Amino acid sequence: MYAIIETGGKQIKVVEGQEIYVEKVTADVNESVTFDKVLFIGGDDVKVGAPLIDGATVTAKVEKHGRQKKIDVHKFKPKKNYHRKQGHRQPYTKLVIDKINA
């Protein structure tokens, strides 16, 4: 059985036991997180939400928090001696999917 959930403005296909990386979730390490925005449940019994499935949840355990690799943003205007450099590291959360409740 698999499910498609929405978190951090993205839709992610998840299976029980899978490790996923999502936008930062405000929960401590080893804490359980519940996602109630379930869009689709597939497998033997298929359920499609319009847009969400009522009563369906996905629970996951927070394994770690971190920051992605640094990206550099450069701004440049020709002939004006204008150069700007800025870096950014996006925070993420690593989750392990525990259970899909249909």
Curated annotation (Swiss-Prot):
A cellular component term, taken from the record's GO annotations: ribonucleoprotein complex
Q: Which UniProt keywords apply?
A: Ribonucleoprotein, Ribosomal protein, RNA-binding, rRNA-binding
**Record's keyword annotation contains Transit peptide:** no
Lineage top rank: taxon: Bacteria
GO molecular function terms attached to this record? rRNA binding; structural constituent of ribosome
A GO BP entry is: translation
- InterPro entries xref list: bL21-like, bL21-like_sf, Ribosomal_bL21, Ribosomal_bL21_CS
Self-association and partners: Part of the 50S ribosomal subunit. Contacts protein L20.
UniProt xrefs under NCBIfam families? L21
**Role of this protein:** This protein binds to 23S rRNA in the presence of protein L20.
HAMAP family, alphabetized: Ribosomal_bL21
Per the record, the similarity remark reads: Belongs to the bacterial ribosomal protein bL21 family.
Q: What is this protein called?
A: Large ribosomal subunit protein bL21
